[in-house]
Amino acid sequence: IRNLRAAIQNPQDYTARSNLMWAATMAENRLIKLGKRTDFECHQMEHQLGAYINCNHGEGLAVLHPVYYRHIYKYGLPKFKRFATEVWGVSADGRTDEEIAFAGVEALADFIKEIGLPTTLRELGVIRQTDLKKIADTVAIVPGSYKQMSHEEILEIFKECY
């Protein structure tokens, strides 16, 4: 987060850009995920979205992740609480674990807006809300996610993102 903010502020900041590339490499090769429970369902949702509207994967995830996380954070509460406190610096003082986790999801949504990424499916090129069911029905539902989604729940997430 710190490096992305620095790189946006100064695109010539070689250290910030190098650190971003290293972090992206670690995230993409899945080395840091070994032995840990992860959730890939939002990526499955975005793959289908991208197939229909040809959007950039990262921009699609920027739109989907906050809404998706609002639907699942209670099912992965320890990890979402840690995400909130460690990544976003959310204070635990006087808050329940659920409140802390939710504050982290909202911090992510705020950050996405701060850096100028799209926040709605309309911004990505989804013209008609009626297209959402067709897209949702083609999403592969993968095992191992914090909450097993149905196609109806995926459609609801798409509608909230519209």
Which residues are covered by each model-predicted region?
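C-terminal charged capping/lid subdomain of soluble metabolic enzymes
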Residues: 91-162
